[in-house]
Regions:
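Acidic (Asp/Glu-rich) sequence patches and key acidic residues
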Residues: 1-209
Length: 209
């Protein structure tokens, strides 16, 4: 749970992958973001994850369902692993070298997996980090992926630059997590026989609103 930016697709021209990576390195250096350049062989069978958005439990929120299959890879996985802030997830800007498509590779045990949907959660970092990541993705899209690169920001900031909406969503999620923590603690204490006061419904309502 937390405000997340999702992105997928490819550069419009695979021949410009090196130029796009140079631009991303320039952005990292200008903003003081640590990063690592990565280049790996990606070959053989991989379990492929496909994600689909569905309506979520709250108004204007979405959930994601996952489908799996198998695919054969014969390419290289190139790009950057970027650290915008210690309290932000790593921003992985990794591409299939052949078609400059955004690609995420993972290995769990003996299983290699691939996904073509990327994301970065910014909930716990300062909101300025969310804004900065959106600026970098806007530049990547404008200069290299106008036709094929898709970005979806759960807060809507990428699309609208509405800071108030971003801050409200962060606050709503933080309040929901606080409520969940309170309720979980009540259940845990009740399970071991302690007497506890139930959560104040009026206080919870005020926090959410």
């Amino acid at each position: 749970m937390g405000v997340t930016i999702h992105f997928h697709g490819a550069l419009d021209d695979p021949a410009r992958l090196d130029a796009a990576l140079a631009m991303l390195r320039e952005e990292c250096e200008r903003r003081g973001w640590p990063y690592r350049s990565l280049d790996f062989e990606a070959c053989g069978p991989h379990e492929m994850y496909t994600f689909h958005q569905v309506p979520g439990p709250l108004l204007d929120w979405t959930d994601v369902i996952t489908e799996t299959g198998m695919t054969e890879l014969d390419t290289r996985w190139r790009g950057l692993s970027i650290e915008p802030h210690p309290d932000c997830e790593s921003l992985l800007m990794m591409f299939d070298e052949h078609d400059a498509r955004l690609m995420l590779l993972t290995t769990v045990g003996d299983t290699n997996s691939v996904s073509y949907c990327m994301s970065v959660k910014t909930q716990f970092a300062p909101p300025e980090i969310h804004v900065a990541i959106c600026e970098v993705l806007h530049r990547l899209q404008d200069e290299f992926g106008h036709e094929k690169l898709i970005v979806y920001d759960e807060s809507g900031y990428f699309q609208t630059q509405d800071m108030a909406a971003l801050l409200k969503m962060r606050d709503d999620i933080e309040a929901a997590m606080d409520d969940l923590e309170t309720i979980t603690r009540v259940v845990q204490l009740g399970a071991i026989g302690d007497e506890v006061e139930p959560p104040d419904e009026d206080a919870l309502y005020e926090r959410r609103n």
